[in-house]
Swiss-Prot record:
Protein name per UniProt: Exosome complex component Rrp4
Ranges of residues in domain KH: 136-194
GO biological process: CUT catabolic process; exonucleolytic trimming to generate mature 3'-end of 5.8S rRNA from tricistronic rRNA transcript (SSU-rRNA, 5.8S rRNA, LSU-rRNA); poly(A)-dependent snoRNA 3'-end processing; RNA catabolic process; U4 snRNA 3'-end processing
GO molecular function, one term: RNA binding
Lineage: Archaea, Methanobacteriati, Methanobacteriota, Stenosarchaea group, Methanomicrobia
Protein encoded by which gene: rrp4
Pfam families registered for this protein in UniProt: ECR1_N_2 (PF22625), KH_6 (PF15985), S1 (PF00575)
Keywords in alphabetical order: Cytoplasm, Exosome, RNA-binding
Length: 260
């Protein structure tokens, strides 16, 4: 069964104590203030937006991409309407201005924490934590930031399953950028799963649906693999089973030829 989609003004609950994100209270009743998915929990009711830009908040952990290097700051694209600023003092060690492009240069991807967002939407970033670092391998997939909770799942159920079933390393930024790393075929499989999660975020039982999807895709991957090859006597050349058999028969014919 699909989850209920609501629009602004829809009645969600008559219990004022349960008002959550994406709601407003009027006459002791809770209404939706967004177009999104009704999110009912024991202690509150809220709305998960169907779409919308990422709006940074303090303590968010995001994946940023360096777009400018100045003598004292790195400026990052954080997949938001506003760029993020990492001051050199927020780097884990002392850095001279001339070193900055060598440490983080334009195009580099980094896991960062949002330190502060002021009233003018100036976004300050931080890197002073062992879990925050430059990403040197893997690739980045972008999903809508409002779909991030579905990628993670209740209690981390979805992301734990994705890691186990694809054998990939995964980090989900709150800005919708997801870093993945692993073997090529595993990355391809995980990328498909993430796209499916994004498209079907409003569906119930999504973790089970994605689990079954991954199992079926694994079967297809195995069935599509080519038949094994035998190595030929010539270095760097491979031969099929049929070629290998023909070579053996040719050698036997030579041995049995009365002229030899």
């Amino acid at each position: 069964m699909d989850k209920k989609i609501v629009i602004p003004g829809d009645l969600l609950s008559e219990n004022q104590k349960k008002a959550g994100y994406g709601t407003y209270v009027k006459n002791d009743k809770i209404y939706s203030s967004l177009c999104g998915i009704e999110n009912l929990k024991e202690d509150k009711v809220g709305v998960i937006p169907l779409a919308g830009a990422y709006i940074p908040s303090a303590n968010d952990v995001v994946i940023g991409i360096v777009i400018v290097v100045t003598p004292s700051n790195w400026i990052f694209d954080i997949a938001a309407p506003y760029d993020g600023l990492l001051h050199v003092s927020e780097y884990p060690r002392r850095v001279e201005s001339r070193e900055m492009p060598e440490i983080l240069n334009v195009g580099d991807s980094v896991i960062l924490r949002v330190k502060d967002v002021d009233s003018s939407m100036k976004v300050e970033l931080a890197l002073r934590d062992p879990s925050l670092h430059k990403l040197k391998t893997g690739q980045i997939i972008k999903v809508e930031s409002v779909k991030v909770p579905r990628v993670i799942g209740h209690g981390g159920s979805m992301i734990s399953m994705l890691k186990k079933e694809t054998n990939c390393s995964i980090f989900v930024g709150q800005n919708g950028r997801i870093w993945i790393d692993g073997k090529d075929e595993d990355i391809e499989l995980l990328s498909k799963a993430l796209r499916k999660i994004e498209l079907e975020a409003q569906r119930s039982g999504l973790t089970d649906r994605i689990y079954n999807f991954l199992k079926n895709e694994r079967i297809r991957q195995k069935e599509s693999k080519p038949v094994g090859f035998f190595k030929n006597e010539t270095e760097g050349v491979t031969a099929t089973k049929e070629d290998h058999s023909e070579e053996i028969y040719r050698k036997i014919d030579v041995l049995l030829d009365p002229k030899n």
